[in-house]
Amino acid sequence: MKFEGLFLVFNSVSGNHKIIGISYLWLAYWFGMIGFYMSVLIRTELSMSGLKIITMDTLEIYNLLFTLHGLIMVFFNIMTGLFGGIGNYLYPVLLGYCDVVYPRVNLYSLLFQPIGFVLVVSSIYLEIGSGTGWTLYPPLSTSLSNVGIDFIIFGLLAAGIASTLSSVNFITTFTSVKTIGFVIDRISPAAWSIVLTSFLLLLSLPVVTAVFLMVFLDRHYNTMFFESSNSGDPVLYQHLFWFFGHPEVYIMILPGFGIISLLLSTYTTKEMFGNQTMILAMGFNSFVRLFGLGTSYVHIRFGSRYSRYFTTVTILIALPTGNKIFNWVTTLQCVESIKSLGLVLFTVLFIVNFVIGGTTGVVLGNAGIDLALHDTVYVVGHFHFVLSIGAIISMICFIIYIQRMLLFGIILSNRLSSLIAPIFMISVLLTFLPMHFTGFSPLPRRIPDYPDEMWGWNFICTLGATMMLVLKLAILFIISL
């Protein structure tokens, strides 16, 4: 096997933005593989009714698996790959710069990522782990005495420092654009996506950093911020966390919008339809996301007035999203020639997944329906369609775009990528589409057992996850030849 990717990681001390970007992608790949293997273990347990791998004495392991799966995939796979990898590699090029303004700060932000990852993963080996869920809701996170939760908190703080440094660097680079003949309104949607993501991170990260520190103080210094028996309020945690968490969904997928727009205009030999409206739609979505936080925890029953408000905000988010879908589909419809069929197939797969996830998101945006479906696997299917799979597809497209499949230096042929795309699509549909049907049953999430009559749908989901695993291993085999 070639070790070019590992060589690039060690040579990232050069401060070159492309090498740092590839190093980010390399880290994101291996972080993502660890998180994906955890999800395969979860699906293996759910393949049949009854407790098979997990026993009554080891139920905490199941809680630990889905907690770390969520944390790793959100903060160390998607954020590292899309914002760190694509942002560092592509952003200065799109602005006409040879590098970002502060290359050394860029390097420091890279070094914080593996530190945070090691802290989070090491929580597995500390006492009984930390099966709190990726949201770390109190009173569960404040009442458990094991030190694993503290390691998770500091690991997430390290990842937050990395994202903050990158955001400041990208915004400073954007405000320093002085290329001759370069007008702000002519900046590509891919560059704007990085800028908007940076602004969202700078607005939301201080809040979630504060709330994690408050949890730490509650655990060790009895500050009682979230302890209801001592004038604290656990709902306050949800308000503060989802001020970050709701924009975070858009933070993770926004660079994906930019790279899909860039690839469509590059490989279809067609200028992006509605380029300016695409930028305006991303900007409007970024702004509205900050005010729709209650959609993610409307089940605590705000009251009819606030429920109507958050339902309205969710519908407003869907409108510019529909505009982006229209622009992409129109660009594809008007193509005269295609340079890379494989890349175009992956972009079509991205659009299909996002349409499915967006449609189910409008359903969950209705407060009355969300009350019934919030704690079911319907939410799991929606979340993976609208965000996780789209983000992974964006990274795959970008890796093919820079002609370094999985950073080992292999050039993925058009025929091979055209074969991988439909297989990936089938595995995604098999894994997550049945969750919408079982969610209406309703099948609760975060539970390792279920009634026998739901065995068929869960087996199909496990089959799709197994197909994804085989596909990833096949790609590793190809690049090792």
Swiss-Prot record:
Keywords attached to this entry: Calcium, Copper, Electron transport, Heme, Iron, Magnesium, Membrane, Metal-binding, Mitochondrion, Mitochondrion inner membrane, Respiratory chain, Translocase, Transmembrane, Transmembrane helix, Transport
Positions with a binding annotation for Ca(2+): 45, 50, 448
Co-factor(s): heme; Cu cation
Keyword Cell division: no
Binding site residues for Mg(2+): 374-375
EC identifiers of the protein: 7.1.1.9
Annotated compartments: Mitochondrion inner membrane
GO biological process, one term: electron transport coupled proton transport
Residue numbers binding heme a3: 382
TM ranges: 22-42, 64-84, 109-129, 151-171, 194-214, 240-260, 278-298, 309-329, 343-363, 382-402, 420-440, 459-479
Record's keyword annotation contains ATP-binding: no
Function as written in the Swiss-Prot or TrEMBL entry: Component of the cytochrome c oxidase, the last enzyme in the mitochondrial electron transport chain which drives oxidative phosphorylation. The respiratory chain contains 3 multisubunit complexes succinate dehydrogenase (complex II, CII), ubiquinol-cytochrome c oxidoreductase (cytochrome b-c1 complex, complex III, CIII) and cytochrome c oxidase (complex IV, CIV), that cooperate to transfer electrons derived from NADH and succinate to molecular oxygen, creating an electrochemical gradient over the inner membrane that drives transmembrane transport and the ATP synthase.
PANTHER family named among the record's database cross-references: CYTOCHROME C OXIDASE SUBUNIT 1 (PTHR10422:SF18)
Subunit structure and binding partners: Component of the cytochrome c oxidase (complex IV, CIV), a multisubunit enzyme composed of a catalytic core of 3 subunits and several supernumerary subunits. The complex exists as a monomer or a dimer and forms supercomplexes (SCs) in the inner mitochondrial membrane with ubiquinol-cytochrome c oxidoreductase (cytochrome b-c1 complex, complex III, CIII).
Protein name: Cytochrome c oxidase subunit 1
Species this chain originates from: Theileria parva
Taxonomic lineage from the root: Eukaryota, Sar, Alveolata, Apicomplexa, Aconoidasida
